[in-house]
UniProtKB/Swiss-Prot annotation:
The keyword Signal does not apply. Keywords: Cell membrane, Membrane, Methanogenesis, Methyltransferase, One-carbon metabolism, Transferase, Translocase, Transmembrane, Transmembrane helix. Pathway: One-carbon metabolism; methanogenesis from CO(2); methyl-coenzyme M from 5,10-methylene-5,6,7,8-tetrahydromethanopterin: step 2/2. One of its GO terms (biological process) is methanogenesis, from carbon dioxide. GO terms for molecular function: tetrahydromethanopterin S-methyltransferase activity. It holds the Pfam family MtrF. The complex is composed of 8 subunits; MtrA, MtrB, MtrC, MtrD, MtrE, MtrF, MtrG and MtrH. Belongs to the MtrF family. It catalyses: 5-methyl-5,6,7,8-tetrahydromethanopterin + coenzyme M + 2 Na(+)(in) = 5,6,7,8-tetrahydromethanopterin + methyl-coenzyme M + 2 Na(+)(out). The gene is mtrF. Its EC number is 7.2.1.4. This is Tetrahydromethanopterin S-methyltransferase subunit F.
Length: 68
């Protein structure tokens, strides 16, 4: 008797690989989402900082020129 050869795919191992792949893709997309949130918060903070600096520097300069 020889070794039996089967053309049937091993469905359980394929499902296991798919589940692992879905898990890893989920982690990658979660990390990307968290990173984009951090980047948008950093950009928002930068914009608020620039506007605040312009206002805080503009008020004394405006008063200085108005008092002349």
């Amino acid at each position: 008797m020889g070794v039996e050869v089967s053309n049937k795919p091993n469905v359980s191992s394929i499902q296991s690989y798919v589940e692992d792949l879905e898990y890893k893709v989920g982690l990658i997309t979660r990390n990307r989402g968290l990173e984009s949130g951090t980047e948008s918060a950093g950009t928002k903070g930068l914009i608020i900082g620039v506007v605040s600096a312009i206002v805080l520097m503009g008020i004394p300069l405006a008063l200085y020129f108005l008092m002349k």
